UniProtKB/Swiss-Prot annotation:
It comes from Streptococcus sanguinis (strain SK36). It is an enzyme of class 1 (oxidoreductase). It catalyses: uridine(34) in tRNA + AH2 + O2 = 5-hydroxyuridine(34) in tRNA + A + H2O. Coiled coil: none annotated. Residues 130-224 form the Rhodanese domain. This is tRNA uridine(34) hydroxylase. Keywords: Oxidoreductase, tRNA processing. Catalyzes oxygen-dependent 5-hydroxyuridine (ho5U) modification at position 34 in tRNAs. PANTHER family: RHODANESE-LIKE DOMAIN-CONTAINING PROTEIN 7-RELATED, THIOSULFATE SULFURTRANSFERASE/RHODANESE-LIKE DOMAIN-CONTAINING PROTEIN 2. The keyword Transport does not apply. The active site is at C184. Belongs to the TrhO family. GO terms for molecular function: oxidoreductase activity, acting on paired donors, with incorporation or reduction of molecular oxygen. GO terms for biological process: tRNA modification.
Length: 328
């Protein structure tokens, strides 16, 4: 059965004059054709994921390709049964990818048009994965890695991308004098991060051209050596990559059983992404810790209209009490 919706994932590092006005004009056009999605615009380029029916997405691609400097912009296309977004957002930012460099000086940022790692095709990347002398580094957030990653890839001990440069500096013995290949969802983060590694003095740095999304669609590699699913920042949450021998590697936050269902911790001050079943979400009040379960503004408790007595009952079932809540 044909799927009616197309999801477009794309980015391009290209100088954009008057980027704030560009963002406003871009939003107006997207709304005029009924497109949904999330787009970041900066002086350094554009980065977005959008969805719509065939006609709408075709209009959008034609429009983008008509813009100066974007004639060759590469759209990665998924076909789906439902919209991947509920609304349309286009926002101006200082950068489309923020590396979190320690001096926070945007003039000292990496320009991928000048400095970036060597591009590897899916076939070349797969060959590198099988090379014991190559270090494979996942540049995504921890919760993205936990849902799915390339076999043998290093999981940096970080919560988000901004922490990655410092983590690499702190663990440089893992990478110095070795070939390093990096990957991310669609390629936008790796363009900048691989350039940063080159600037740091790493001699042999490669990146998966087009990211995981392209690797999964390649007719030759068919996503092989990828375990789990790929996390995406839209209503789908995850997509399949390995079409040869897929496996589930995600583990439930609470009991460690295989799981590929993500929720945000019920404590709005925590908001950690955790893998868990519906059963355990109910059992643990969607809280990743006792502190989060008993937090006065626990969203799970509010959404389900639980009384204090019901909360006490749920906590007692897992050997906990409301004492922390009372203390607050």
């Amino acid at each position: 059965m044909a799927k009616d919706i197309r999801v477009l994932l794309y980015y391009k590092y290209v100088p954009i004059e008057n980027a704030e006005k560009f963002a406003a004009d871009h939003l107006a056009f997207c709304k005029s054709i009924g497109l949904k999605g999330r787009i970041l615009v900066a002086d350094e380029g554009i980065n977005g994921t959008v969805s719509g029916d065939y006609e709408t997405t075709q209009k959008y691609m034609d429009y983008v390709h008509s813009l100066p400097g974007m004639e060759d912009l590469w759209f990665k296309i998924d076909e789906e049964n439902e919209q991947a977004f509920k609304k349309m957002f286009v926002r101006y930012k200082k950068e489309i990818v923020h590396l979190g460099l320690e001096d926070n000086d945007f003039d000292n940022d990496i320009n991928p048009l000048e400095t970036t790692g060597a591009y590897l095709s899916p076939k070349e990347f797969k060959e590198a994965l099988l090379d014991e002398d190559t270090v494979v580094l996942d540049t995504r957030n921890d919760y993205e890695y936990d849902l799915g990653h390339f076999r043998g890839a290093i999981r940096p001990d970080i919560r988000n991308f901004r922490e990655l440069p410092q983590w690499v500096r702190d663990n440089k013995e893992k990478f110095m004098d070795k070939r390093v290949i990096v990957y991310c969802t669609g390629g936008v983060r790796c363009e900048k991060f691989s350039g940063w590694m080159v600037r740091e003095g790493y001699k042999d740095v490669g990146q998966l051209h087009g990211g995981i999304a392209t690797y999964g669609k390649d007719p030759e590699v068919q996503g092989e050596l990828w375990d789990g699913k790929m996390y995406v920042f839209d209503e789908r949450i995850s997509v399949d990559i390995n079409h040869v021998n897929p496996v589930v590697i995600g583990k439930d936050w609470f009991d460690g059983t295989p799981c590929e269902r993500y929720v945000n911790c019920g404590n709005p001050e925590c908001n950690r992404r955790i893998l868990t079943s519906e059963e355990n979400e109910d059992k643990y009040l969607r809280g990743c810790s006792h502190e989060c379960r008993v937090h006065p503004r626990n969203r799970y408790v509010a959404e389900n209209g639980l009384s204090q007595a019901e909360v006490v009952e749920r906590l007692a079932a897992i050997g906990e009490s409301l004492e922390t809540l009372v203390a607050q």
